[in-house]
Design a protein with these regions (language model features):
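Terminal "cap-and-tail" regions of soluble proteins that handle hydrophobic small molecules
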Residues: 35-129
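Hydrophobic-ligand binding "helix-grip"
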Residues: 1-27, 33-41, 127-128
Length: 129
């Protein structure tokens, strides 16, 4: 199943594609693709992680509020409520996501210095540090 939407936010709008694919083990794979056109200077400063980590948190909330993850996750999925978002576990998640999105940027051809600056900015925006 596929669902195409237009995602609007203060910085602009872009296409959002959600795809649900059944897996052989009875679970369902959710794929999300959000495309945003960003100013080159903004992207150089933030990289993909600044926007992507917001989606990571959203998908974590979805996983925490559904039962499907029980079959595939080795540990309980945290609920990203306001208290959790201010805590140390959230900080570890945000830092890990920022590192992974920087690695994705490097793999896509962004130079490492720019990607690592974006990683730092992503952490700063989401954690205030």
């Amino acid at each position: 199943h596929r669902l195409g939407l237009t995602w609007q936010q203060p910085t602009g709008e872009g296409p959002l594609l959600l795809r649900l694919d059944p897996e052989d083990d009875g679970t369902t794979l959710l794929a999300l693709r959000h495309t945003m056109l960003l100013d080159a200077a903004d992207f150089a400063r933030t990289g993909p992680g600044a926007l992507a980590v917001g989606w990571e948190i959203t998908l974590l909330a979805l996983a925490a509020h559904t039962d499907g993850w029980h079959a595939t996750c080795l540990a309980p999925v945290p609920v990203p409520n306001p208290e959790w978002l201010q805590g140390p576990q959230s900080a570890r998640y945000v830092r890990a996501w920022a590192v992974r999105w920087a690695a994705e940027a490097i793999a896509a051809g962004i130079d490492e210095t720019t990607a690592r600056l974006g990683e730092s900015e992503t952490v700063r925006r989401h954690l205030g540090s």
